[in-house]
Curated annotation (Swiss-Prot):
This is Protein SYM1. May be involved in cellular response to stress. Required to maintain mitochondrial DNA (mtDNA) integrity and stability. Keywords: Membrane, Mitochondrion, Mitochondrion inner membrane, Transmembrane, Transmembrane helix. InterPro entries: Mpv17_PMP22. It comes from Candida albicans (strain SC5314 / ATCC MYA-2876) (Yeast).
């Protein structure tokens, strides 16, 4: 296990974006696969067992690797360098705690509601070719945005506090991706439960 971690760390240092793109794609795809396995009959209340949808899973992998990972990579670097508590700089522990709290607030009050959740639903709507795109995106927001955001606030703030406080910036997206296996299962379930 230590070898795998050391190898992954070396890849993160040498090629951070590519490493994050591959990791995120695989873990978002894993979340979709779990959603299909655990909630196979959620599509339009169909009671028949549905076969595994490989194209749906491929779309999830594409979203994770090509859309979310580059944005997430930049987002965590932005939070780490630009969202910093500057008052009481003579007390480093206080400054670190307040910077962490501020990062969680920005992440949960800006990124989640206005970037992360809309990006997922609009990207998946387009990747699934649900035309007319704009009408279907608006419908998905109307039916799922608020419930997803409330669920997000149950899962992410506490985790993100520890993520931002304890982990170096290069490992934050990986930590989010690991927790996101469950979160992506939920997102995939919500995305495909109300077409």
């Amino acid at each position: 296990m230590k070898y795998i971690f050391n190898r992954y760390n070396a890849l993160l240092l040498r090629r951070p974006l590519i490493t994050n793109m591959i990791t995120t794609g695989l873990l978002v795809g894993g979340g979709d696969a779990l959603a299909q396995f655990f909630f196979p009959n959620n599509d339009n209340n169909n009671l028949e067992q549905q076969p595994f949808d490989y194209l749906r899973n491929l779309r999830a992998i594409i979203y994770g690797s090509l859309i979310f990972a580059p944005i997430g990579d930049k987002w965590y670097k932005f939070l780490n360098t630009k969202v910093v508590w500057t008052r009481n700089a003579q007390k480093p522990q206080y400054q670190r705690s307040m910077s962490t709290l501020l990062r969680v607030m920005v992440d949960q009050l800006v990124f989640a509601p206005f970037i992360g959740i809309p990006l997922y639903y609009s990207s998946m709507t387009i990747l699934e070719n649900r035309q007319p795109f704009l009408d279907n995106i608006i419908d998905k927001f109307n039916t799922s945005w608020w419930i997803t955001l409330k669920s997000n606030w149950l899962v992410w703030p506490l985790f993100q506090f520890f993520n931002f406080y304890l982990l170096p910036v290069q490992f934050r997206l990986l930590a989010v991706n690991i927790i996101s296996i469950g979160w992506n299962t939920y997102l995939s379930y919500v995305m495909h439960s109300q077409k």
